[in-house]
Amino acid sequence: MGGQACAVATGPGAGAAARDQAAVAGIRTVLTTQTAAWNRGDIPGFMQGYWKSDSLVFIGRRGPTYGWQQTLDNYRKGYPDAATMGQLDFSGLRISLLAPNAAQVVGRWHLARPSAGDVQGHFLLVMRQVGGQWVVAADHTNSE
């Protein structure tokens, strides 16, 4: 992910603009932290960016999965070793705030896997701020 431009707003909307900038920065931090964990082969660390709730929903090629633990278990089954996990990269991120504590993120993912073959696709995340932290509450990911 490239550098970010930062504008400081003044006037009546300055508080909202600053809050929005902080939200976007917080969301980017979650995604950067997840990428780093994945690239270390740390699926539990990657999962820290997800809402630790039975209400979490992940939609992939096999349909919806509900709950944090089931999502973790599915990741562990689908990516049993570092070679299968590869190196994750997100690009083309578009973050849209829906409310002060909710956002959607659209982007592209790519796994560089020299021995297992590269895979890539797109995703749509719904993120919520829970307990002051941004987390993924819903993840719809596809592969090409």
Residue ranges and their predicted role:
Residues 5-49, 70:
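Short, low-complexity N-terminal intrinsically disordered segments enriched in polar/charged residues
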Residues 43-98, 118:
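A solvent-exposed, acidic/Ser-Thr-rich amphipathic alpha-helical stretch
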Residues 56, 63-65, 111-112, 142-144:
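Solvent-exposed loop/turn segments at secondary-structure junctions
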Residues 75, 91-96, 108-111, 122-128:
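Hydrophobic/aromatic beta-strand elements that line small-molecule binding cavities or substrate pockets
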Residues 101-109:
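A short hydrophobic beta-strand element
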Residues 118-144:
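Short beta-strand edge/turn micro-motifs at domain boundaries
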